[in-house]
């Protein structure tokens, strides 16, 4: 039986609540350590490239002006490795005292399901575009204008940073970017947020849906982009249900890599052909395509769930 019924036991003999609190501590400490190490790497690269120390001290925002694409991607990879790989690995080995393969009830993947997962993830882009547009256009009441200004400024800064490491000058840079932006986060974030955090929440709350949605919210929030929180949370929920139903961490990993990968490919296509579809803009697609894509995604989720329900029933 592959389906995860009660959450995989990674408590290390502790109570479910204390285990969850330890996991939560690992997530936030890992996040700040990853940010710190990534920042140190950025500063070192900038100093090597001749950045004056007084300029960096007075205006840290100019840091990326002294970094090439390869260096920006390297610092991003450093952050991802520390936060998304080392954090869950240390928790599993030091606290849970288990190997990382404990996160899957099923060994290997089935090619038809891999193909369906990639197609389903692509079709989810059409549905998620509505959440992207709605989230991006949220406006707060006057008394929250300070928060709105802060969130908009942070969004603009992160957009500029994203542009820095998605401006590819050749195919080799695109491949490096694909690994750093799609493959590494796809693997690491699923190990951390679905494999460790979701299982820990599932064991504590005894409710799979609460575990999935709370994990998805933390996954969305930790990216520090309020105006992208809801679509990221929706993505996290999709990954969470794929994991719950299959008991196989590799299906959410494949879906996550596909989602990020589609965006990287679209950006590279835009730079090569000087045109590309805007996946964040619902008006970029005909209404029939939007509805069709959404229906295909819903059908995929239904069939994926039923596949593993039938597997469970046949084993009983």
Regions found by a protein language model. Give the residues of each.
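Hydrophobic core of alpha-helical transmembrane segments in multi-pass integral membrane proteins
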Residues: 27-31, 84-89, 118-124, 288-308
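Functionally important transmembrane alpha-helices
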Residues: 217-281
């Amino acid at each position: 039986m592959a389906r995860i019924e009660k959450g995989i036991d990674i408590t290390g003999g502790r109570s479910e609540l204390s285990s969850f609190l330890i996991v939560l501590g690992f997530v936030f400490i890992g996040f700040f350590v990853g940010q710190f190490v990534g920042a140190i790497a950025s500063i070192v690269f900038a100093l090597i490239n001749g950045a004056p120390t007084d300029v960096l001290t007075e205006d840290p925002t100019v840091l990326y002006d002294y970094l090439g694409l390869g260096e920006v991607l390297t610092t991003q990879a450093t952050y991802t490795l520390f936060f998304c790989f080392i954090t869950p690995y240390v928790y599993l080995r030091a606290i849970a005292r288990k190997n990382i393969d404990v996160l899957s009830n099923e060994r290997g993947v089935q090619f038809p399901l891999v193909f369906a997962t990639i197609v389903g993830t692509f079709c989810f882009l059409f549905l998620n575009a509505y959440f992207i547009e709605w989230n991006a256009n949220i406006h707060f009441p006057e008394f929250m204008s300070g928060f709105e200004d802060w969130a908009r400024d942070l969004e603009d800064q992160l957009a500029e940073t994203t542009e820095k490491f998605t401006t590819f000058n050749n195919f080799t840079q695109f491949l490096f970017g694909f690994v750093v932006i799609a493959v590494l986060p796809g693997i690491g974030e699923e190990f951390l947020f679905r494999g460790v955090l979701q299982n820990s929440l599932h064991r504590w709350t005894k409710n799979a849906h609460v575990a999935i949605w709370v994990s998805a919210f933390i996954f969305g929030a930790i990216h520090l982009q309020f105006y992208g929180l809801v679509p990221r949370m929706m993505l996290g929920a999709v990954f969470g249900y794929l994991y719950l139903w299959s008991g196989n961490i590799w299906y959410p990993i494949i879906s996550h890599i596909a989602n990020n990968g589609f965006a990287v490919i679209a950006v590279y296509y835009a730079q090569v052909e000087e045109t590309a579809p805007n996946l964040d803009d619902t008006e970029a697609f005909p209404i029939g395509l939007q509805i069709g894509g959404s229906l295909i995604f819903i059908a995929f989720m239904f069939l994926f769930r039923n596949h593993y329900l039938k597997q469970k029933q046949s084993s009983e």
